[in-house]
Amino acid sequence: MLIVLSVGGSILAKNLDPKHFSAYASALKELARKHQIVVVTGGGVAARNYIDVARGVGANEVVCDFIGIDITRLNAQLLIAALGNTAHPEPPTTYKEAESALASGKIVVMGGVIPGQTTDAVAAILAEYLNADMMVIATSVDGVYSSDPREDPNAKKFDVMTAKELVGIVISTEMKAGSKSPVDPLASKIIERCNIDTIIMDGTDPQDVLEVVLQEAVKTDKVTGVRLGTRIIG
């Protein structure tokens, strides 16, 4: 099974802790024993800090995006270092390069690709391009809610939802000042378009990601919920 995993920078590189990179590497190695794995890493706090400085000195948003992409690739290189010879040695910089890297039989780790695309959007486009069997978005929340749970104490968590429902929630949440959706609008639209089996889950503990993916990869019933997450169905 080919699995694309999007790991947010705030999850993977929150404190730039070597032990956390190593823990993620261990989980990925275990997954790779049975599956092909492609990982897209985010930029996290470091990317936001650099982008803030860039804006402060007058850089436009495209330049800021390129800076963010550079940071995502640094995080990718750190994870590659933790994976050792089980990983393709360089992070691909295009979708075609990622496809070629898969032929190595190793875990492929990459960062951003082009300005205007978030980590989740890159992962969704990549999953569609590669005809992946599953996409997992490892984020800082345990699934999709009816509204931002940080802002609304009555927010309801979905165990299972359609891609169309996801798009609606993402758009309505993003329109509210200060609220943040679990994925960005472009990623949600790509998920809807390509109809890929998608899980959005809390990725703080890489062992949780390992457990959920191993369980879901062998399920024949793809309309049931998942622990620590939300399943997106067509």
UniProtKB/Swiss-Prot annotation:
Its EC number is 2.7.4.22. The keyword Magnesium does not apply. InterPro entries: AceGlu_kinase-like_sf, Asp/Glu/Uridylate_kinase, Uridylate_kinase, Uridylate_kinase_arch/spir. It is found in: Cytoplasm. Pathway: Pyrimidine metabolism; CTP biosynthesis via de novo pathway; UDP from UMP (UMPK route): step 1/1. Inhibited by UTP. GO terms for cellular component: cytoplasm. GO terms for molecular function: ATP binding; UMP kinase activity. It comes from the Archaea. It is an enzyme of class 2 (transferase). ATP binds at G9, S10, G44, R48, T139, Y145, D148. One of its GO terms (biological process) is UDP biosynthetic process. Its main location: cytoplasm. It catalyses: UMP + ATP = UDP + ADP. The keyword Nucleotide-binding applies. It holds the Pfam family AA_kinase. Homohexamer. Belongs to the UMP kinase family. Catalyzes the reversible phosphorylation of UMP to UDP. PANTHER family: URIDYLATE KINASE, URIDYLATE KINASE PUMPKIN, CHLOROPLASTIC. This is Uridylate kinase. The gene is pyrH.
